[in-house]
Structures are given as C-alpha cells and as structure tokens.
C-alpha cells in the first residue's frame, strides 16, 4: 500500500508543549498507516477514531476517510462523510479536497476528478510534498480509473520537495505502483529498491517486489521475495496473500489454503477484509470456507459484491433460484462502473441451471 503522514514544518521556539502534542499525534498517524499497510483496517480505523476523539481536526478526518478508500472494496459513502466533516472544520483543507476528488475517480468520473486534483495542486502552489504525493497516489488507486503517467509526475515532484526532511518509503512504493500501471517493471523495481533503503519494515518492500516478479512470471524471484518478507516479519499479512496467489498459480491447493489461513490470522477482523478472504477461498475452490467466512460478515458489510459472491456459492450448490435472487440484488445495488463481463457469464449459467431444472421437472 502507499501512505504518508505529515510532520510539522515550522516549530515555534518555546512552544514545547505544542511540539510534543504534534509529535505524539504524528506518531499515532504513523501507527494507523502502518496498520493500513498491514491489512489491519479495523485497527487503523480504531486509531484514527481515537485521534478524532482527542483532536477533531480536518487532517484527522481525512485519515479516517482515507482508510475507507484504502480497504479492499472502498466504502465511498463513509469516506465522503469524513472528508465532508474535515472540510466543515477547514474549508481550505487540501487533503479532504483530494479525498472527495478520489471518490469521484473511484466512481468513474475521471475527467472531473482529475480537474479537481489539478485545481488542488494549483491552489497549493505545489509547495507541499504531502499534497503532491496524495494527488499522485489518488491517480493510482483504482484499477480501471487512473492516470499513472500524471501520477508519476506528481509523485516525483513530491519526492523532490521532501528531500529536505527525508523521503518516506511510501512515496517510493506509490511511484513503483504507478510505473507498474504503465507496464514499466524496470522503473517500478528501481522505485522499490529506493524504498528498501529507507523503509523501517522491509517486509513491505519484499512483498511488493514479489508481486512485481509474479506479474512478470519470474516465479523463482517471486518466491524468494515472499520468503524474505515472511522471514523479515512473520506477522506481515500481505506476504501470505502473495504466497497464496503464488501457490494458486502452481495449483498447490493445500499450500494455498494454509497461506490463506495465515493471512486470516495476521490480518484483522475488519468485515471488508473478511469479505476479501471469502473471495480468495472461493477462487481456491474452498467453497465451505468461503461460505462460512461470508456468512460471518454478510450482515456487517454494505458492499454489494457480497450478493454476487453468495450467488456464485449458491450456483455451485445448484441452488439456482436463490443464486438468481442474489445476483439480481447485486445488479440493483452495485455502481454500474463495477459491473464486469464475467457477471453476465454468471447470469447465463444460472439461467441455464434454472432451465435445466424446469426441463427435468417436465
């Protein structure tokens, strides 16, 4: 993942108490961001909510809103709610303006979102590294709605601005992610190498390198970096997710299941994470585990994807009638931009199953 927290740029001599308070707050932000990177979304939200309870600043509301965008399936409604609260406190808050533009990007309103992000850059006069970074990051967050070339421009500007205080590893992670989106693995790996020079937890770097090697079908190097990530920090959940994906490629069913068990163990029990785990179990044909995991959080998540997953599971059980009902509910609730071609494929096989049952009954 790709995150950044700001530290005070100017500290007035003699304001020791203010400095200590700001430092403690920054440390807390850092802790929250580390949890986001580790796929511990519930813990991160808990931290950001605690920050708001102590100090309801525009920045703190931004981080909470951002956590809802960072989870596997973004919750745009709750993200917007927090960005709006941040802007109510400070109408000029660049971060919360970026947050709202990011929501538009996620919903497919690309031209409008980029125009708003560009306006924020203009208003800030491109003086703040964090603002530049967040704009660049926003342009990489959504698979089908992004602008990696523009992201690279903004992130490089952020890196240049941050040199004086030290460039955070998160900047380089995101730069690498942007290069990956442009299908430039060489520069992506270079960015990850630069991240490894400053990262406190190198497991995060090895994980990203592993997924990059996997995408390039360099499986030996992918495996080496997965092992490095786990050996560096055995509690770093994303490494086990990468390991599960690696084992799945080689059709190692039992090993994939064990990797998913470990991922579940070290990620937290945030409902959005559990929904992701249910999907991973389904992909691995662990249908019983997928159903059990989905059932535990079905009423706790608002993401319409839950209806589609349940439809898949019911289709697998030849329960075509309920599968049809859940798929129809999914269509009724989901953003149109999230509907993918395979959804029509599921619909077709469900109707084929219903037709077959009717024929048998006749």
Descriptions of predicted regions:
Residues 2-15:
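Bacterial N-terminal signal peptides that target proteins for export
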Residues 15, 19-362:
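Alpha-solenoid helical repeat scaffolds
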